[in-house]
Amino acid sequence: MMRKRTFALIILLLTISFPAYAESLLTTDALKASYEELTLPGKERMGMVELGIMHDFTDNISLGFGSWMAVKGERGGFITIGLDGGLHYPVTEVIDLDTGLSVGAGGGRGGYTLSGGGLMLRTYAGLRYNMGSWGWLGAGVSYVDFPNGGAIHSTQPFLTYTLPFTSFIENGWGKSQQSLGDKQYNRLSPKVHSLELVTRKLFMASTSRTDTGGEQGDLTILGIEWRTYLGDNWYAKLETEGAAGGSAGYMQILAGAGYRIALTDKLFADTDLSLGAGGGGGVDSGGGLLLNGSAGMQYFLTPHFFAALSAAHLKATGGSFQANTLAFKLGYQTGVHTPESAGLAPACMQIRVANQTYQQASDLWRSHHANKSIENLGLQIDYFIKPDWYITGQAFAAYQGDAGAYMTGLVGPGFRKNFYGNFYLNAEALAGAAGGGGLAMGSGVVWQGNAGVGYEITPSLSALATLGRMEAVNGDFKANVKGLSLAWKFKANEHSNKAFQ
């Protein structure tokens, strides 16, 4: 029943947005950050920060996705991911009524006794003030509920900030029927993007301890990093990583800004600062707030593919967690300038909202409730490098099955091919990190393979059903996986940046 209600809420958010979406030359997206403090059992307080991205489907309706992360209190590592829908109504020329609903999943530092199955529902209402080019600043009241057996039911004030930017996004991947005038082109936010697969070694400081007081060993983490270049040199970044050795269940999400310079036509140096949240796996990250500073080098193997090395210092502000880190990255960059480009470089992308069901395939697959299947809510972002081939980054979190706090991040190649009318075949080979919720993940390294059949409902909206298998590389977890997803297919027309040749 809870699974049906959760999927019904997701369908509601999508059906409100997509039919209302009118094709326009320029659309508005926004980066969003919010803060609120939840009241937990025993009057414990937990400060949470949201980082997300929203897309305006009309002047009044927006839909996006984001993550809530603990940054204050004693629950570092409490993280959720999900969908966020918003309704905005003008009250005056500079003040809007701001309301919305979020459907998410996750948990941590309290397990299923705190977050239950992991399902999180958040409703909110408030006002926001238009600061012009500085964005929107808002405040209001929210209610957060973990209804699937969780212990969190909290009402609290919140603060929020959104920074809009302009995009040229078209539904589907067909040949563009629209063009921009000079004034519209100048309003288009410049974007050169990169997606990187990251493996990072954390060399822990001698003062670092576990949350039980023991010596904290070194960690290996796997994840992805996304960059958006704001000009020739400056970039914004978002990275998410999970433990693949040392402390299974540890996860971190960092956002920040950096600066890159060209040393040769193929070699670049960069440096950046970021902050975010992390914890879990017995790591002493205090309230969860993390600071990170890094410097590195990139070498382009082809005009799009590159390899990179970076060194960083990572520190929790409220715990003993502290490490020097060394990372190796393989990445793909969009928006490469070519003599044939006319200023705009189309990027074919797809965003999927998915439900995956884990079914027991090993007697020791989890430490409790072994007879229960696990329902997971997830987001999948696909970037197509060829008409039938894509690179995907995926995140899933449990919302039913008494596995609250379970989360996984996966990356890998995918294949999509139409074979009859609107029907298409889909296959993926994924690897990544997973942990939490009592699942027997060993060091945290996992692999997953999926295959299925999809149907294109419209040129931009499709449904996909899959069957797959997921296993821990050196743990007892083994599960058969059933998946169902809804996908939005779109083309983002971007500035080609002449700095990257």
Predicted segments with their positions:
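Residues on the lipid-exposed face of transmembrane beta-strands in outer-membrane beta-barrel proteins
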Residues: Y35, L51-H55, L83-Y89, A125-Y129, ...
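Gram-negative (and chloroplast) outer-membrane scaffold detector with strong preference
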Residues: H55-G111, E225-G281, G378-V446, W488
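N-terminal signal peptide c-region/cleavage motif recognized by signal peptidases
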Residues: S17-P19
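Transmembrane beta-strands of outer-membrane beta-barrel pores
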Residues: Y35-P41, S67-G73, V103-R109, V141-P147, ...
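Repeated loop/turn-to-beta-strand initiation elements of outer-membrane beta-barrel proteins
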Residues: D29, D59-F65, E93-L97, Y129-A139, ...
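Solvent-exposed loop/turn segments connecting transmembrane beta-strands
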Residues: L38-G47, A70-T80, V91, R109-L119, ...
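Outer-membrane beta-barrel "beta-signal"
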Residues: Y35, I152-L180, H193-M204, Q322-Q360, ...
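Transmembrane beta-strand segments of Gram-negative outer membrane beta-barrel proteins
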Residues: E23-E37, I61-F65, L97-T99, N186-A205, ...
